[in-house]
Amino acid sequence: MGALSDVIVLLGPELEPWRCARFEWEGDRLTRIERREPVLAIAAGARVVIPGLYNSHTHMGDSCLPDGATGLTLEEGFFRPHGFKYRMLAQLTREQHLPHVINHLRYMARTGTVGHLDFREQGPYGSELLREAALVTGVESVILGQFSGVPFDASALAANASRLPPAARAELEAILAVADGFSESTMNDLTDAAWGEIRELTERQGKLRAIHCLENAGYRDVSLGRTGRGDLVRALELYDPHLIVHLTVADPAEIALLAASGKTAALNPRANANLGLPVPPIRALMESGANLLLGTDNGLLNSPNMFAEMDYTYKLAKSQYGDAVRPDPLAILRMATCNIRGVLGPSHPGCLAEGLPATFVVLDFERPHLRSTRHIPASIVTRVTPEDVLATYRLGSPLYESEGFSARPS
């Protein structure tokens, strides 16, 4: 059993801050939350408990190459088969690679992240590597495996008729034996028939499907030129993904299509900006009613710090709204917490209440820049740093605890 006394807890899917006399858990469940009063501002510090954060789009395989693509375009740095990251990853042994991934998952826990959805390159080997790192650290890695190579040459892609070659089909089955689902870089990497095969196999096995869409205009333009349909349209029609990533250049019609589909989108504004791309239309996506998540994208581009991602997203959204009032900072915090249910289902509520998973983060609002906050949610989104994280728990077990932190009952 664990317990905290006299803490502020963001409760329920509304993430409403309450001063609580007791916050207790036993095993993997929250067992007692004794509320006192709702609270928005504090004058003399507190410990603040929030749901564990979910990083909904990562590539932790390339976390061993921080800032290695500086000065390179998206295509030069990240596209198969000759992009920088693929050339560098191919040179690493397992013994060289695994410690980097483990260290970055530990950094996630240090910064309040309990789980992530990872586009894992390098075929079955890549998925196995990340699975091992997750077991070592306790961070939940939802692994979305990718082919190790490019199954089709340019002529086959232009013809857009071929099914998966037998070797690619066998690799797909091997990936799904390890991973939680499948992902690809773009809809333009495979033929329509291949996407149909992947959808059929993943549906039969109950696996997740994810895809990058509209990261730049080229994604749409290549798809239109080859098939007469944009990449988002093809993704929804052929692949039926659970998660669509980026939407950086989505136009009003594409945003409406996403919202009508009921699909979840993961935004990655820091990565988009770092690549010199447009930032996503956050305001329009929020106003559409689509379920939105946040991710930090490639470890090569960004440290996987969700507090930094929330801060940047919130301020971009305010700029796009054009006033100092919108959006509510809680809407941004939900993108890193309870909105995860839209992809992972009711086993991952992303919020705190009695009977729900004991998956939470304890923040030190005794620190000088936090102790007299006038708006607790806004300060969580814009002011919390990794040094302010006292503890990160997943399913009742600590992933990280700062020196001197104690959660023993008293």
Segments (PLM) and residue ranges:
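Mid-domain alpha/beta scaffold segments of enzyme catalytic cores
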Residues: Y107, G115-A179, E184-S185, D192-E197, ...
